[in-house]
C-alpha cells in the first residue's frame, strides 16, 4: 500500500517488426477506484523489436487497518498481436497497524453523567468492540454511581465512541470521590490503555449555625451547633467568647470564664455542642 504504485509488465511472445498497441483499463474488485487506487485507462505501445512494456497504476495510501484488497487490469483491442492473457490482478497489501484502544477519564458533579471516550490509534475497515466494566474506588460501585458492564462498538471507519456512567446525588458534604472503568476483550483491535478514572465532584456544603442561649447565674450554658447536612469527614470549628457591646452585657472573665476552644463534629453527625459555665 505504501509503495505508491503498482507496475504491470506486458510481454510479447516474440518481437514484432511493427509497433504493437493494446488498450488497457482497471476495474474494481474489493479495492475501490478513487479510494484505494486511481483508475487508469490508456493505450500501451510496444515499439517494433521490443517485447515488454509497463503500465503503472497509482495506489492510495491510508491509515485504515483492513484486509488486503484487489482490483483488475484488463487488456483489449490489440493491433499487430493477439492477447493470450487479458486480465491481471492488482493486489494491494495492507501495511497499517492493528488499531489500539485507549480510554479517557470521565468527570461529573454528583447526580450528573460522566462521559468516557474510547479512541483508536487508527481506523479499521471492520467494527471494533470492547467490553467495559465499572468498579469501586473511594466511590462505591452501585451506590455513588450506577454499576455498568457493557460492550462498546466503534463502527468501521470511526476512531472514537463514547459511553456514559450515571452518578447518584446525595446531600452529604464530602470529598470528591473516584471509581474506575476498565476495558477488556477487544475484537479487531488491541488495548493500549485499559483503565480510566470516574471522578465525582461533590457539590454539597455543610452550613454551621449557632443560637443565643439564656441561663441563670451559676448555670452552665450549652451551645448546640447544628449542621445543614452530614459530612464525609470530621468538621472542626473554633469558638471564642467575648464581652457584648452594650454596658448591660455580661463581662468576659468576670460574669463567666472566658472560653476559647475547638469543637469537632464527628463524621456522619449533623450537630455538636460546647459549654460555657
Regions flagged by a language model, labelled:
Residues 1-277:
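Short boundary segments that mark the start of a structured unit
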Amino acid at each position: 500500500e505504501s509503495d505508491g504504485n503498482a507496475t504491470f509488465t506486458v510481454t510479447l511472445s516474440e518481437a514484432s517488426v511493427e509497433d504493437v498497441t493494446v488498450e488497457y483499463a482497471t476495474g474494481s474488485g474489493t479495492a475501490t477506484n478513487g479510494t484505494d487506487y486511481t483508475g487508469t485507462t490508456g493505450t500501451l505501445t510496444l515499439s517494433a523489436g521490443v517485447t515488454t512494456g509497463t503500465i503503472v497504476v497509482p495506489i492510495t495510501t491510508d491509515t485504515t487497518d483492513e484486509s488486503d484488497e484487489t482490483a483488475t487490469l484488463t487488456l483489449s483491442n490489440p493491433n499487430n498481436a493477439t492477447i493470450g492473457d487479458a486480465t491481471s490482478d492488482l493486489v494491494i497489501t495492507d501495511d497499517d497497524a492493528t488499531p489500539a484502544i485507549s480510554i479517557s477519564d470521565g468527570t461529573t458533579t454528583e447526580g450528573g453523567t460522566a462521559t468516557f471516550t474510547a479512541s483508536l490509534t487508527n481506523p479499521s475497515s471492520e467494527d471494533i468492540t470492547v467490553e467495559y466494566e465499572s468498579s469501586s474506588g473511594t466511590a462505591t460501585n452501585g451506590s455513588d454511581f450506577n454499576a455498568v458492564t457493557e460492550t462498546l462498538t466503534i463502527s468501521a471507519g470511526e476512531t472514537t465512541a463514547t459511553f456514559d456512567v450515571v452518578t447518584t446525588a446525595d446531600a452529604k458534604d464530602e470529598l470528591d470521590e473516584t471509581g474506575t472503568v476498565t476495558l477488556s476483550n477487544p475484537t479487531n483491535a488491541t488495548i493500549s490503555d485499559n483503565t480510566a478514572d470516574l471522578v465525582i465532584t461533590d457539590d454539597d456544603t455543610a452550613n454551621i449555625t449557632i443560637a443565643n442561649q439564656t441561663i441563670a447565674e451559676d448555670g452552665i450554658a450549652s451551645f448546640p451547633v447544628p449542621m445543614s447536612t452530614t459530612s464525609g469527614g470530621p468538621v472542626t470549628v473554633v469558638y471564642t467568647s467575648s464581652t457584648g457591646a452594650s454596658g448591660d452585657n455580661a463581662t468576659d472573665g468576670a460574669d463567666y470564664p472566658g472560653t476559647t476552644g475547638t469543637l469537632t463534629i464527628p463524621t456522619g453527625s449533623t450537630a455538636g455542642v460546647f459549654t460555657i459555665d
